[in-house]
Amino acid sequence: MIFISIEDFYEKVSSFSKMSRQEEKECALQMKEGSTAAREKLIQSYLPMVAAHIRRRPAYMQNLGFVLYCQQALEKAVDSFNFLQDSETFVHRLSWHLRQTDTKYIANCR
């Protein structure tokens, strides 16, 4: 997904809705079979959480570069998480990846 500005990102992301746990499991099964559409659907359902994370950051971090870092963190979290196990919640895994992204972005910018 391509964004022209941070406002464009917020606007496009606001149209996505969160999935239920059952829908996540169905997408996970489809992902296991190799479906990239299911992966994209999972990623899109968590973009509003990423947008909320970005909004809570200082002004110097609210730019498209940081959006890209956060999108990569979301993709990494989706790829590494086993939705079929109930060991931890995906939100916990995603928030961990986003905090790592904050640190990485700050280190690379200064």
Predicted regions mapped to residue ranges:
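Alpha-helical promoter-recognition and RNA polymerase-docking modules of transcription initiation factors
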Residues: 1-110
